[in-house]
Amino acid sequence: MEHVARLNAVSHRYKAVFALNDVTLDIPAGQVVGLIGPDGVGKSTLLGLIAGVRRAQEGEVTVLGQDMRDARARTALGAKIAYMPQGLGRNLYPSLSVRENLDFFGRLFGQKREERHARISMLTEATGLAPFLDRPAGKLSGGMKQKLGLCAALIHDPDLLILDEPTTGVDPLSRRQFWELIDRIRAKLTGMSVVVATAYMEEAERFDWLAAMNDGQVIATGSPEDIRTNAGKATLEDAFVEMLPKEEGEEVGVTLRPRVEQNGAVPAIEAFDLVKRFNNFTAVDHVSFTIPEGEIFGFLGSNGCGKSTTMKMLTGLLQPTEGHSKLFGEELENGDMAARQNIGYMSQAFSLYAELTVRQNLELHAKLYHIPAQRRAVRVREVLDEFELTEIAEALPDGLPLGIRQRLQLAVATIHEPRILILDEPTSGVDPLARDAFWRKLISLSRDKGVTIFISTHFMNEAERCDRISLMHAGRVLDVGTPQELTERRGAQTLEEAFIAALEGETQAEDAPSDTAGLTADVATKTASAAHRATSRLWAYTTRETLELVRDPIRMFFALAGPIILMLTMGFGISFDVDKLSFAVNDMDRTPESRRLVEAFSSIPQFEQQEDFSSLDELDRLMERGDVTLAMEIPDGFGKTLHQGLTAPEISIWIDGSMPFRGETTEGYTLGLLTQFAEDLEAETGIESSASLSISTRYLFNQAFKSAHAMVPSMIMLILMLIPAIMSTIAVVREKETGTIANFRATPVRKVEFLVGKQLPYIVIAWFNFWVLVGLGLWVFEVPWYGSLPVLGLAALFFVIATTGFGQLVSAFTRTQVSAVFATAVIAIIPTVNFSGLITPVSTLAPIGRLIGLSFPGAWFQPVSVGIFLKGFGLSDVALNILMLAVFSLIYLVLSVLALRKQEA
C-alpha cells in the first residue's frame, strides 16, 4: 500500500472556527510521518479523523484503504489502528497497575488469557517495564508513562500507530529514549506506519516525512531535508518561520542584548532551601538560587518537576513547608500584598476574564493593583500602545489568536509596572513567530526597564535566550549557569545534550534505556469467535470499573455507606407521627376533677407535661418560643360545675397552628381525650350518654399507624433511584473528563459493550444495597413483613438495572462530573418524590402528574415495595410492575446507545 491515509478536501470546524480548511494530503505508508506546527493549527483534529475518533464533516478520509465515514469500516479498522491521544498517559488508568492496564487493552482486542500474558511479558521486557508490573500507572515517571502508553498501543500489533504529541511535557532524556525505542520497535515490527504530531521542531528532524501545518492548512510537505532546503534555512524551526505568512515590516528573529551588571546591587530574588510538600509528596526539595535585578533567569525542566510550585512560592501564592525567600532583600511572607505590588505573574493558563474586553481587562487589573484613578486611564493607553493592542481594545479575549492573547496576558501582568515578572511557561502552544515577538518584548523589558524576568519553558531555543538557567528535575535544581557554561560543563555540543547528561546522572533504573531484543510480532494468536471477542470487551470494562471503584475510597464509601446513611436519616428524621407534644396547664380550680383531666393528657405517650403557666402573657411567650404545642386553662369552679351537671363546664385550650398538619392532629387528640374523659365520668355517675352512635376507627395494613412502617418501603425506592443513578453517570462522565473515552472511540468496542460493561458493577452494588436496606427496615425500624422476599428481590434487580441505566442516559448529555451529578439528582428526585407515590398515591394524581410519575421507574417499584412489605403481595400481584421495570431497563439502554457518541464532532 503506497499511502496509509489519504485526505481529500477535508474541512472541520468548531462552531465558526476552522480547525482544518480544505486539506488534501496523502500520507506515505511504512514511514514515520510527522505533523509539525504550534497548538491550534489542526494537528490533533487531523489525527482524530485518521484514528476515527472524530466524525468527518466535509471531504473524504481514507485509512488503510477504508472510508472512515463508514461505521463498519471504522469498526473493522479498530483492530489495525493504535491511537495515543494528546496528554501524557491520558489514556491510562492511574489506579490500575502496569499489568492491569495492559490486560485491559488486551481484552479490548479479544485476546485470550495466554496470548495476553505472552504479549504483556514481551512488551514490558522490551520497554524495560517488566520490574514495575505491579506499580500503579499514576505513580510512574513521565518516561515510564510514555512507555506504558506505547505498550498499550502495540499490544494488538497495529498496522498504523498514531501518536498525538507523545513527548510534550517530558524531559529531553525521556524524549530521546522514547524515539530510540520507537526506532527499535519499527526495526522489529516491519511494515508498521507511524503518524506523529509534535510541536518540537528538533524532534521532527528525525522523522522520515513531514507535513507542516498552520491555521488549519498544510503549508509544506516532504522530508526534513527537503523542507529546510526549500526554505533555505539550516534548521526546521527557521524553515517553519520562513514559511509562515508575514505582515509587511514584521520583525523576524530574536537578538539577546548583553545585560549591564550592577555591582553591589541587592538581588531581586533569593531562595534559600525552599521545600514544599503535599502530604507525603515532596514537590520542591531544598531549592536555592539568586537572581540579580534585570536578569532573564530560565527554569528548564519537565512537567511535574516543581517549576510551577517554586514560582508560586516566590509570588506568595504558596507557603513553603521549609526555607524562605527574599524579594529585593525583604523577607517574603505569605499574603504579603506589598511584595506582590513588585511582582507580575503569568500562570500557565490564561487568567483573563472572557466576558470583558481587552481594555476592560486592563482597567480591572489597574484597579486591582491600586493604580491611582488619575493615572489609571493614562497607564491603560500606554500599555495598549506598548503591546500593540489598540486596534483590538474592544474585542473579547476568547476571539483573539493565541499569540495576541499571550501578548494581552503579558500586558495585564505589567500594568502596574512591576520590578519582577514571573512567567510560567508563557509560550506553550504559541507559533514560532508569536513566540519570537513575545521574547523581543521580554528582552526590551529586561534591558530597557531593568525588569527581572523569571521564566519557565520546555523549549531549548528559548532557554538559550536566557542570561542564566537552572536545570530542574524531580523537585531539585541540578545545575545553574549560563547556557554556554552548562554546555561546556557537561562536555556537550548543545544545551539539550547538556540537560540530558545532567538527567542521566539523576534518573533511576526505571528510566534506563530499553532492550527490544525479545520483541517479535510472532506471538501465537488464537482466533477468537465473535461472541468471545464481544464478551472479552464487555468484561474488560466490567473488570476495570470494579478495580477502579474498589481502589477509590470516596466513591466506594458513597456507594456502600451512602444508602445506609440516607435510610437512617430519612427513616428516623422523616416521620408523620405526631407524638411527644409538650403541653402546659394553668389549673385555677385545683380539685380532684381538674387534676384528673390533666392526668388524662399526661398519662399517654402523645403528650409531655411541662411546668404550669400562671398568666396569658407567660403563655404567649411559651407559644412564641415553641416550648409548648398545647396549653389548657381550667377555670375556678370547674369541678363544682361538673358535679352539679346542670351546665357543661368550660375550659380554654390553645393549640400551636404554625404547622397545620401537626396542629390538626393535636386537635384530634384533644377532642378524643375530652370525649373519653366525659364518657368515663358518665359511667361513674350513672348518667347515660346522649350519644346514640359509637364510632371506632381501625387502619388496614398499618394497624399501628406508624409512619415508619409506611415510609421505609418508599425510602428504599427513593434511595435506589438516586444513589445507583449518580454512581453510574459518574462512571461514564469520568471517562470524558480524564480522556480515557479515547480508548472506547479508537478500539473495536461497541457502544452496548461499553455501557453494559460499566453498568454491571453498579448493578451488583445497588442490589447488595437493596438487601441491606431491607435488613434495616426489618430489624432497625421493625417494619412488619407479609409478602414474598424473592419477588421483591426480583423487582429490585430490574429496578436497579433501570436506575443505573437512567444514570448512563443522563451521562450522554453531560461533560463534567459536577454537571452529571447535578442533572441526575434533579431529574431523578423531583418526579420520584412528587409523582411516584411517596407522598400521594399515583392513582390520585391529576392526569398530567400521573403521566409524569408513570414515566419513571420509581412509580412502578414503589407499589411493589410497599405492597410486599405491608400487604402481603405475591408475584401475581406485581407481575405487571416487574415487567414494566424490565421494559424501562431496556428502554434506557437503547436510548443510551443511541445518545452515546462513538465519534467526537
Task: Give the residues covered by each predicted segment.
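Extracytoplasmic/periplasmic domains immediately adjacent to an N-terminal transmembrane anchor
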Residues: 528-709
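Helix-to-loop junction immediately C-terminal to a conserved catalytic motif
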Residues: 51, 315
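Conserved ABC ATPase "signature" region
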Residues: 103, 107, 114-132, 363, ...
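Conserved ABC transporter NBD signature motif
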Residues: 59-70, 76-79, 323-333, 338-339
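Membrane-spanning alpha-helical segments of multipass transporters and channels
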Residues: 245, 569-571, 590, 611, ...
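Catalytic Walker B motif of ABC-type/P-loop ATPase nucleotide-binding domains
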Residues: 161-164, 421-424
